[in-house]
């Protein structure tokens, strides 16, 4: 088959800038073949190379005594004691989910699960952080339905409980939804599998499902802005099969017990290209692939298509040669393909052969570790506009503006479509704070949360970055967990615009400072840039996935308020309304600075709560919606009313950081007050749970009326009642 001629248009269609193409010519000393152009395009795009963010990502704290493996592998690995480790990562599937919501979201789940079990871990939990456009936008309901169905269909069939996440709506996501998928698994800490190849002449083995044309060019598409040609990109979205993935999991874990695996890597973005290059580059080796041996489900596939296909449920492995028969038998038992498609070589070459023709012969290291890296110009985000004087609003009317919005209404419609209990170890389902999953057969548990407030990050990227980490820290400590480590999913617009690059730089600086101050290192992550449509960028959305350890489930804080319990706030309340949920929902404005995060107070208050968790019935962090929304959510979940003493809007709805709302008995409250005074921790009694009404100062409404609004607003705003 004749390959296309290399033209300026073809180079541009592959997402390569003229100076990058010039660099390719200098590296190889000739014009690339069509297949080579595709390989460079895939490896040098933002999705695979992190060329715009790498400089700043290096500044993040990634180590600690608990960290076994930080960024650079398929997922991060953290010690949880007793010879066990938790393996986790968060990754975006934004562009595919906008083009084809069901399959885009489903394969996002599949990809992150493979990242985890590639390391030798059995997945035990998933989460999803979702951002959509305005509820009234013509595409939003379609996207919400498709994405939620896709996540549920894949995760439920695979058999991993979905224990948390976020769902938000904002006009900036109208043309570019975000789907950030998180997965965590358990492994023996001395049996972690890595991706660096070793040994010359070792067989390179293809495992799993067959290769088709789905997803060809997916990584390049994920590194571009959208425009009005978006519907034409549908073929670049992959198609997932969770049953095959489940078989692949079991086959891989079985194989890993046999001392057969030298290295292993899942085939994700850029498929066979990226997995082979990363394995070779990390091991300082070259790779030769013979594509005639690649299992194919379509006819007449070209080398270009096979190298760039993103067909799902596939892995690449470097195998001990003497173990071939044993390994093949395992994969055939699970009805999966097992094919030797190449070998490791000593030279720094990526050699691709198809039909006895050399289709690509490139210096392998130049594709990965020596890929372009940019120090892009950036401008700091200017100070946010000052808060205008707000119109008067009654406290209950203010609460209704929040719970009547899909951003803060009950999200049961979403998580009731997910299997939250499969595996029988889920201790705390989605809905109130962090999800909690027992470490099977033990009294230990792991807590999981995902957090970010994009309004804050836009107004003040540095403080917004700090706050995302601090909120994850609080959500973990609020359930009694010791925060261990984080994964970050940095979703931003076009980094070639200095103001967008400034958002990214500011957020990374804030994230780094918070992670360092809280001993909460980043061990894995993902960067998704060019989240723009027709030149309009999303709110900067650096999602933080946090993982914590509950050493003994007796220390879990996960009850509900009881009749007569006191409501107390740990931490200082100043009444900060800038960029608050109330101002956005009740008045439709986004103004003022983001709340500033005192990391010393965050740590002190979090450690105080963990130390005295036995005294409280329940704890929740105070963030979006402040005290009023948190108190209502706890009361509503318990089927109780709540009375807060203050009627002052700033006291009720302010979003000061480093705060928790706790419920406890009169007797325990006295002990908590005494302990707080001794520790120098601010603690204030703010009200009481009980009765059948929600009252703020003298303003009240029946709990039943508010509960009906809270539990119906999500579906009504999106016309999902009949979905």
From Swiss-Prot:
Gene Ontology biological process terms, A to Z: 'de novo' IMP biosynthetic process
Annotated transmembrane regions: none
GO MF annotation list: ATP binding; magnesium ion binding; phosphoribosylformylglycinamidine synthase activity
Matches recorded under InterPro entries: PRibForGlyAmidine_synth_PurL (IPR010074), PurL_linker (IPR041609), PurM-like_C_dom (IPR010918), PurM-like_C_sf (IPR036676), PurM-like_N (IPR016188), PurM-like_N_sf (IPR036921)
Sequence positions that bind substrate: 92-95, 114, 238, 310-312, 528
Compartment list: Cytoplasm
Binding site for ATP: 50, 89, 488, 525
Annotated Pfam families: AIRS, AIRS_C, FGAR-AT_linker
Presence of the UniProt keyword ATP-binding in the record: yes
Keywords from the UniProt entry: ATP-binding, Cytoplasm, Ligase, Magnesium, Metal-binding, Nucleotide-binding, Purine biosynthesis
Annotated pathway: Purine metabolism; IMP biosynthesis via de novo pathway; 5-amino-1-(5-phospho-D-ribosyl)imidazole from N(2)-formyl-N(1)-(5-phospho-D-ribosyl)glycinamide: step 1/2
Annotated positions binding Mg(2+) 1: 91, 526
Its EC number(s): 6.3.5.3
Residues annotated as binding Mg(2+) 2: 115, 266
Top-level EC class: ligase
One cellular-component annotation, GO: cytoplasm
Catalytic residues identified in the record: 47, 93 (proton acceptor)
Reaction catalysed by this enzyme: N(2)-formyl-N(1)-(5-phospho-beta-D-ribosyl)glycinamide + L-glutamine + ATP + H2O = 2-formamido-N(1)-(5-O-phospho-beta-D-ribosyl)acetamidine + L-glutamate + ADP + phosphate + H(+)
PANTHER family, sorted: PHOSPHORIBOSYLFORMYLGLYCINAMIDINE SYNTHASE SUBUNIT PURL
Function as written in the Swiss-Prot or TrEMBL entry: Part of the phosphoribosylformylglycinamidine synthase complex involved in the purines biosynthetic pathway. Catalyzes the ATP-dependent conversion of formylglycinamide ribonucleotide (FGAR) and glutamine to yield formylglycinamidine ribonucleotide (FGAM) and glutamate. The FGAM synthase complex is composed of three subunits. PurQ produces an ammonia molecule by converting glutamine to glutamate. PurL transfers the ammonia molecule to FGAR to form FGAM in an ATP-dependent manner.
Subunit structure, interactors included: Monomer. Part of the FGAM synthase complex composed of 1 PurL, 1 PurQ and 2 PurS subunits.
Record family assignment: Belongs to the FGAMS family.
Official protein name in the record: Phosphoribosylformylglycinamidine synthase subunit PurL
Species this protein is from: Paracoccus denitrificans (strain Pd 1222)
Taxonomic lineage from the root: Bacteria, Pseudomonadati, Pseudomonadota, Alphaproteobacteria, Rhodobacterales
Gene: purL
């Amino acid at each position: 088959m004749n390959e296309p001629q290399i033209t300026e248009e073809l180079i541009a269609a592959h997402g390569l800038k003229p100076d990058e193409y010039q660099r390719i010519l200098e590296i190889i000393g000739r014009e690339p073949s069509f297949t080579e152009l595709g390989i460079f395009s895939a490896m040098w795009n933002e999705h695979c190379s992190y060329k715009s963010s790498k400089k700043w990502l290096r500044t993040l704290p990634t180590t600690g005594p608990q960290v076994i493996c930080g960024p650079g592998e398929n997922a991060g690995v953290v010690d949880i004691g007793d010879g066990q480790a938790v393996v986790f990562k968060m990754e975006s599937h934004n562009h595919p989910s906008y083009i084809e919501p069901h399959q885009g979201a489903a394969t996002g789940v599949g990809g992150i699960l493979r990242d985890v079990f590639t390391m030798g871990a059995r997945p035990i939990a998933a989460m999803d952080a979702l951002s959509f456009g305005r509820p009234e936008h013509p595409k939003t309901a379609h996207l919400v339905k498709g994405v939620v169905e896709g996540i549920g269909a894949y995760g439920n069939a695979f058999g991993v409980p979905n224990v948390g996440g976020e769902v938000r709506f904002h006009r900036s996501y109208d043309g570019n939804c975000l789907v950030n998928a998180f997965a965590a698994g358990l492994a023996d800490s001395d049996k972690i599998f890595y991706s660096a190849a070793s040994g010359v002449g070792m067989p390179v083995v293809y495992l799993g499902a067959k290769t088709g044309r789905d997803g060809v060019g997916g990584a390049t598409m994920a590194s571009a802005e959208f425009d009005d040609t978006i519907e034409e990109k549908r073929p670049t979205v992959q198609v997932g099969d969770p049953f095959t993935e489940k078989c692949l999991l079991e086959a891989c874990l079985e194989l890993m017990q046999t001392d057969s695996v030298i290295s292993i890597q899942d085939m994700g973005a850029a498929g066979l290209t990226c997995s082979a290059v990363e394995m070779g580059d990390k091991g300082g080796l070259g790779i030769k692939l013979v594509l005639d041996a690649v299992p194919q489900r379509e006819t007449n596939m070209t080398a270009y298509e096979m190298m760039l296909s993103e067909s799902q449920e596939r892995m690449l492995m470097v195998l001990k040669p003497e173990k071939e028969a044993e390994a093949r038998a395992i994969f055939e038992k699970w009805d999966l393909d097992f094919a030797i498609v190449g070998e490791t070589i000593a030279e720094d070459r990526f050699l691709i052969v198809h039909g006895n023709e050399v289709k690509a012969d490139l210096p392998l290291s130049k594709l990965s570790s020596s890929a372009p890296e940019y120090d892009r110009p950036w401008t700091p985000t200017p100070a946010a506009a000052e808060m205008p004087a707000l119109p008067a609003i009654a406290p209950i009317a203010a609460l209704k503006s929040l719970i009547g919005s899909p951003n803060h209404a009950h999200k049961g419609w979403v998580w009731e479509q997910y299997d939250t209990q499969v595996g029988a170890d889920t201790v705390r389902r989605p809905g109130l704070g962090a999800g909690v999953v027992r470490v099977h057969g033990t009294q230990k548990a792991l807590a999981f949360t995902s957090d970010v407030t994009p309004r804050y990050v836009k107004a003040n990227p540095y403080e917004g970055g700090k706050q995302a980490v601090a909120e994850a820290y609080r959500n973990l400590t609020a359930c009694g967990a010791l925060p261990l480590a984080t994964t970050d999913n940095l979703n931003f617009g076009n980094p070639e615009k200095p103001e967008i690059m400034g958002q990214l730089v500011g957020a990374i600086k804030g994230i780094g400072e918070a992670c360092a101050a809280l001993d909460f290192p980043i061990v894995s992550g993902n960067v998704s840039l060019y989240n723009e449509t027709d030149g309009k960028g999303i709110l900067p959305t650096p999602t933080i996935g946090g993982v914590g350890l509950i050493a003994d489930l007796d220390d879990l804080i996960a009850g509900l308020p009881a009749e007569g319990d006191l409501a107390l706030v740990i931490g200082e309340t100043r009444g900060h309304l800038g960029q608050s949920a109330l101002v956005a929902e009740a008045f439709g404005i986004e103004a003022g600075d983001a709340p500033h995060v005192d990391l010393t107070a965050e740590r002190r208050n979090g450690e105080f709560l963990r130390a005295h968790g036995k005294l409280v019935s329940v704890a929740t962090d105070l963030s979006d919606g402040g005290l009023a929304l948190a108190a209502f959510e706890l009361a509503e979940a318990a089927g109780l009313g709540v009375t807060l003493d203050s009627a002052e809007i700033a006291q009720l709805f302010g979003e000061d950081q480093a705060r928790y709302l706790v419920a406890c008995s009169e007797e325990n409250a006295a002990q908590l007050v005494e302990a707080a005074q001794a520790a120098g921790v601010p603690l204030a009694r703010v009200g009481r749970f009980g009765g059948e009404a929600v009252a703020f100062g003298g303003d009240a409404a029946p709990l039943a009326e508010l509960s009906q609004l809270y539990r119906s607003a999500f579906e009504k705003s999106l016309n999902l009642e009949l979905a």
